[in-house]
Amino acid sequence: MNLILLGPPGVGKGTQAKLLIDRFGIPQISTGDILRAAVKELTPMGAKAKGYMDSGALVPDEVVIGIVEERLAQADCQKGFILDGFPRTVPQADALGQVLSGMGKSIDHVVSLSVDKGELLKRLTGRRACANCGAGYHVDFAPSKVAGVCDACSGQLVQREDDKEETILNRLAVYEAQTAPLIAYYQAAGLLRSVDGLGTVEGVQSGILAAIRA
């Protein structure tokens, strides 16, 4: 089964991907992870990417696609894969389709997880980290025993810049601008499966399984 997992920051893609990996025995492919791995291993495409990254430039689509193609050609992808965070744009989706076609493969389902903006803000702005040991907490879902104090080392709990409301709103705006055309693209192709990301981890997983088996 070849899946694409879409969803805004804070929707729970990582958690759901792990459950799907365990259930289907297929790898999760995150472009950030495979880009770093390709650069470290100096694969042909990794070497190209390193040149751009060393100069502070964005890695162009054709190099990212090449790295994705290298990864999809590996043996553990023969039974399927989960693409997480890729494609991000319609041109990337077109290029991915061409790569897969050349490999005799195609995307089976595109799962789009959605949660309303208020809930996403609550999930993300509530995150706290210990300034001393790095332990993670959440003011609503996983609070420390003493407010603002780490249970493990008594360090101060802080909110990262990435978790501040203004930063999150900007990230969500970028995601929506990029992904709206992509959702329309996959909907037109008959591949989109929309799943409500609000609920328990198990409940959302059941929703995903029902959607891809429908």
From Swiss-Prot:
It comes from the Bacteria. The keyword Repeat does not apply. It is found in: Cytoplasm. It is an enzyme of class 2 (transferase). Residues 126-163 are annotated as: LID. One of its GO terms (molecular function) is ATP binding. Its EC number is 2.7.4.3. Keywords: ATP-binding, Cytoplasm, Kinase, Metal-binding, Nucleotide biosynthesis, Nucleotide-binding, Transferase, Zinc. It catalyses: AMP + ATP = 2 ADP. The keyword Iron does not apply. Its main location: cytoplasm. One of its GO terms (cellular component) is cytoplasm. Pathway: Purine metabolism; AMP biosynthesis via salvage pathway; AMP from ADP: step 1/1. GO terms for biological process: AMP salvage. Catalyzes the reversible transfer of the terminal phosphate group between ATP and AMP. Plays an important role in cellular energy homeostasis and in adenine nucleotide metabolism. Monomer. Belongs to the adenylate kinase family. This is Adenylate kinase. It comes from Citrifermentans bemidjiense (strain ATCC BAA-1014 / DSM 16622 / JCM 12645 / Bem). The gene is adk.
